[in-house]
């Protein structure tokens, strides 16, 4: 029941203990940083040619299967209006740029466009979205909605139904408080889906459905949205979201 006299110090002061490991780590950090910087310079200068999938400087491609660099390329593309619009064009998304506007206190949009169709699915009606939000929606449709519909329902998503996108209003339509991300065209409220075979699913009717395929698809749709949107709110969040997914790219983080 009694530990050896020095047992408590083993691993802390031994030749491979934490102090030694920390010293080794400090010695390696600078060479590693220099090596990475040199590698980045060679790639940027064209001396090392990588395939687009492994090139961190290649534009984000909606059609490309997500990999280790997807997050980096997605963030870089979202931050650059020209890259963002080019990525949507390559994906076959009908994104019609609209002039920047200020429509009220804390309301308006920049780098936005009117969008009515994604790569494979249409929107029930065209909406105005900021380009980064449209890009997230396009990637979401390609990599999560389509596969989820095939897996759970043996069909495809033909149309995305929604309750709107841009609107100059506060969060939850409150009379006072912070502006919603809808006020800057950085959010869309998705209320349902129409499949290629004509079936229609809505959050109101199918979120708690006894039909496991329908309910499973909607939960997979919610979980997939969390991969591309900073904030995804579903009926699990609160009663105000009983009939839609709130999807926004305004900078917050939530997946509920």
Question: Which positions does each model-derived feature cover?
Answer:
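Short extracytoplasmic/periplasmic juxtamembrane "stem" segments immediately C-terminal to an N-terminal membrane anchor
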Residues: 54-76
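Catalytic cores and adjacent binding grooves of peptidoglycan-active enzymes
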Residues: 27-33, 179-256
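N-terminal Lys/Arg-rich, disordered targeting/topogenic segments
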Residues: 1-24
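Hydrophobic membrane-insertion alpha-helices, especially the h-region
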Residues: 26-47
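Second-shell loop/turn segments in exported
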Residues: 69-75, 127-138, 176-177, 203-212
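A charge-rich, low-complexity, intrinsically flexible signal that marks solvent-exposed coils, linkers
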Residues: 21, 107, 111-113, 242, ...
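Active-site-adjacent substructure of cysteine-protease-like catalytic cores
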Residues: 151-185
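Active-site acidic/histidine clusters and adjacent loop/turn architecture
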Residues: 73-160
């Amino acid at each position: 029941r009694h530990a050896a006299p020095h047992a408590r110090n083993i691993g802390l002061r031994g030749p491979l203990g934490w102090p030694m490991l920390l010293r080794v780590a400090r010695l390696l950090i600078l060479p590693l940083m220099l090596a990475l910087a040199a590698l980045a310079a060679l790639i940027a200068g064209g001396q090392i040619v990588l395939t687009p999938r492994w090139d961190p400087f290649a534009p984000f491609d909606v059609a490309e299967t997500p990999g280790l660099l997807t997050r980096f390329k997605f963030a870089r593309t979202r931050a650059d209006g020209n890259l963002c619009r080019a990525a949507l064009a390559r994906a076959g998304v009908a994104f019609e740029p609209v002039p920047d506007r200020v429509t009220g206190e804390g309301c308006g949009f920049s780098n936005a466009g009117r969008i009515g169709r994604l790569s494979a699915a249409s929107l029930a009606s065209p909406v105005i979205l900021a380009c980064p939000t449209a890009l997230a929606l396009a990637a979401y449709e390609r990599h999560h909605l389509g596969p989820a519909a095939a897996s759970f329902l043996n069909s495809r998503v033909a149309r995305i139904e929604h309750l709107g996108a841009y609107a100059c209003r506060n969060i939850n339509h409150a009379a006072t408080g912070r502006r919603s991300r809808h006020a800057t065209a950085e959010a869309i409220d998705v209320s349902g889906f129409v499949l290629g075979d004509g079936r229609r699913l809505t959050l109101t009717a199918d979120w708690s459905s006894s039909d496991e395929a329908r309910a499973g698809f909607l939960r997979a749709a919610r979980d997939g949205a969390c991969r591309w949107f900073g904030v995804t709110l579903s009926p699990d969040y609160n009663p105000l979201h009983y009939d839609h997914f709130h999807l926004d790219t305004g900078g917050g983080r939530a997946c509920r």
